[in-house]
């Protein structure tokens, strides 16, 4: 089955708008198991139960709360959540560009492919080629299913990839961990030991070929499952409808020049106000 886009919209940088489609770059390969009652093989159903009364709680009586100070809660209303939620928009807005070498891979979270839609090829190619030539990455904001993410935009093979980024605040500080210090003398490591370790690394050095590696656990489980399957079931998953997108032809040269002029004005204004 051909892949379907998550949404159709646009990617913007400066005043340039490029109509694109966003596709998941990673397929679902995780094995999901259902829980059954071994006595009659019926599905196990979870209920929303009140801890004190043991009674099931209807959805209209459930509220969301943030726990603080061990057992104390602040009720968060749905209208408050809606106000905090970002405006739903089918666009990727590049806010700045950074040298690609400065973006540490630990920030990468989830990849998506960007594909140009009709009349968007020229702007798409301009963005792809300028990212290659300048060896830069676009830092952008993107909203997916009502949640805003930080993302990196960079060329990948023949196309452009968007990789969601983790925020710096998500990382634990290494100070919290009992890690060895940078002073190797403290651990009495000899030059010979380092040399032998280096030889081992060089002996194991090879080219990175991702297609060589497979999820062996999944393969074993699926082989075992398929051996037991006598009948199969199919599941239909509803996909989000694609939003209409403008495909008007634009003058990219003029937009690029005007974007540069706008940035220069902003910089002059900032330096003059100091």
Curated annotation (Swiss-Prot):
GO terms for molecular function: double-stranded DNA binding. Gene3D superfamilies: 2.40.290.10. The keyword DNA repair applies. SUPFAM superfamilies: SPOC domain-like (SSF100939). Keywords: DNA damage, DNA recombination, DNA repair, DNA-binding. InterPro entries: Ku70/Ku80_beta-barrel_dom, Prok_Ku, SPOC-like_C_dom_sf. One of its GO terms (biological process) is double-strand break repair via nonhomologous end joining. Belongs to the prokaryotic Ku family. This is Non-homologous end joining protein Ku. It comes from Coxiella burnetii (strain RSA 331 / Henzerling II). The gene is ku.
């Amino acid at each position: 089955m051909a892949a379907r886009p998550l949404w159709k919209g646009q990617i913007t940088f400066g005043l340039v708008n490029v109509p694109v489609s966003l596709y998941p770059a990673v397929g679902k390969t995780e094995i999901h198991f259902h829980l059954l009652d071994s006595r009659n093989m019926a599905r196990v159903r979870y209920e929303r139960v009140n801890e004190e009364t043991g009674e099931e709680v209807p959805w209209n009586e459930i509220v969301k709360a943030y726990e603080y100070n061990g057992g104390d809660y602040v009720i968060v209303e749905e209208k408050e959540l809606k106000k905090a939620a970002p405006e739903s928009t089918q666009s990727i807005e590049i806010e700045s560009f950074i040298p690609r070498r400065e973006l540490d891979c630990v920030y990468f979270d989830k990849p998506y492919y960007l594909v140009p839609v009709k009349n968007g090829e020229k702007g798409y190619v301009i963005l792809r080629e300028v990212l290659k030539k300048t060896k830069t990455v676009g830092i952008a904001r993107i909203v997916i299913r009502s949640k805003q993410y930080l993302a990196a935009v960079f060329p990948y093979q023949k196309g452009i990839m968007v990789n969601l980024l983790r925020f710096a605040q998500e990382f634990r500080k290494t100070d919290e961990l009992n890690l060895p210090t940078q002073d190797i003398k403290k651990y009495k490591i000899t030059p010979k030991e380092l040399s032998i370790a280096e030889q081992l690394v060089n002996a194991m050095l090879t080219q990175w070929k991702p297609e060589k590696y497979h999820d062996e656990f999944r393969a074993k489980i699926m082989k075992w499952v398929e051996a037991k399957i006598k009948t199969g079931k199919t599941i239909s998953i509803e996909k989000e409808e694609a939003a209409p997108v403008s495909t008007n032809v634009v003058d990219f040269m003029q937009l690029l020049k005007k974007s540069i002029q706008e940035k220069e004005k902003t910089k002059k204004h900032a330096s003059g106000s100091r």
